[in-house]
Amino acid sequence: MAGLLQVRDALALRATSGAQLSQSLATPLPLVQAMLDRLTAMGKVERIEQDDGACLSGGCKSCPQPRGAARCSTG
């Protein structure tokens, strides 16, 4: 199970959603959500709301894959 610092580091490296963090860290989603809420309250991370088609990394302009492609790591 992941700790608070592992969640913070994984978020910094991957910039992914809570569900993806939960899966990659093998930690229950409610616990990951609670950790993200705690990190937000501490000012260590900032919640960014994105629409469904938005790129998580902001690298879509340079991404060789079409936007929304299954293998694209940025879309």
UniProtKB/Swiss-Prot annotation:
GO terms for molecular function: DNA binding; iron ion binding; iron-sulfur cluster binding. This is Probable [Fe-S]-dependent transcriptional repressor. Belongs to the FeoC family. HAMAP family: FeoC. It comes from Serratia marcescens. May function as a transcriptional regulator that controls feoABC expression. It holds the Pfam family FeoC. Keywords: DNA-binding, Iron, Iron-sulfur, Metal-binding, Repressor, Transcription, Transcription regulation. The keyword Nucleotide-binding does not apply.
